[in-house]
Amino acid sequence: MKKGGGNGKRIIVGIDGGGTETLALAYDEGGRLVGEGIAGPSNPHNVGVDSAVENILSAMYNTGFKKADAVCVALAGMDTSKDISMMKSAIPKLSDHMVVEHDAFAALYAETRGAKGVLCIAGTGSIVLGYDGTERHRICDYGWLLGDDGSGYRIGCEGLRKAVKMLDGEMRRSILASYILDATFSDDLDALVSWGYSKQFRVDSIAALSKVVDRAAAEGDVAALKIINEASTSLARCAALMSRKIGVDRVYTVGGVFDSVLYHRIFKNYLSRSRISVVRSTKKTALGAVLVAADAVGLRLRPNRT
């Protein structure tokens, strides 16, 4: 483990701590990628603070650097200033210049480098973030209980609820119920309910069911189609509101839920009615974190790999 590159150049590290995995990228001040590390999820609200910190450190150390000249840790679940303060205190000092950020801001920063813009994340959770060049504004970012409109968790949860209603006779059974049973290794309603309330319950486990719902929707399942339509429309509505607030006609999207052809089409069509274009971000959130860290120490880094 080392600090600083072998050529004496400063090392800048950006860490993207999401609900599924944690990715760390290390660059030298010349813009060369010199290390990359991957670890488990690090949203403290989903996995707990201790596990989140453990995965952040693992990702950092896996880059080959124990410390760096500047570090930005961009985390999912940073819903309040209290969350950020909590994680700043919990994460060991990885640099004399360490910043803890919301992952959505880092993702937007990767695209705009501080210019105004709007970004939507739809992964395990969801957020619509707007930045006007001075202040940040957000919608939906209040966690799995109070927010996460249009997220993988919300889609998976609705799929699970619909499957329960089908299995207890409240709704006509469709292929969605069969897919949910298979995905949760459940033989019947009792087993499915037990799975949902098990001590091993994790938000990302529910979110993973969104792919099952999307599969059923792609095959024409009416209940699944309704879930996907309502989820995508809900997030698109928030994106349109934020775009008007910030004064932009482009929305960047990030997150695995947008891999759904149906979800993406509904989202894009909704915004097109307001003449707002949708651009799928191809830049890693961890890269945005690198840029935030670099700019924080006055280094205008130009990464040679985006």
Question: Each predicted region: which residue ranges?
Answer:
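ATP-binding/phosphotransfer module of carbohydrate and carboxylate kinases, centering on a glycine-rich
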Residues: 1-68, 90, 111-116, 160-306
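Short acidic capping loops at alpha-helix termini that bridge into adjacent secondary structure
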Residues: 67-69, 96-97
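Glycine-rich beta-strand-to-loop/alpha-helix junction loops that act as flexible
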Residues: 72-78, 122-125, 248-259
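Flexible, active-site-adjacent loop/turn segments at secondary-structure boundaries
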Residues: 76, 143-144, 195, 255
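Phosphate-binding/catalytic loop of phosphoryl-transfer enzymes
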Residues: 78-173
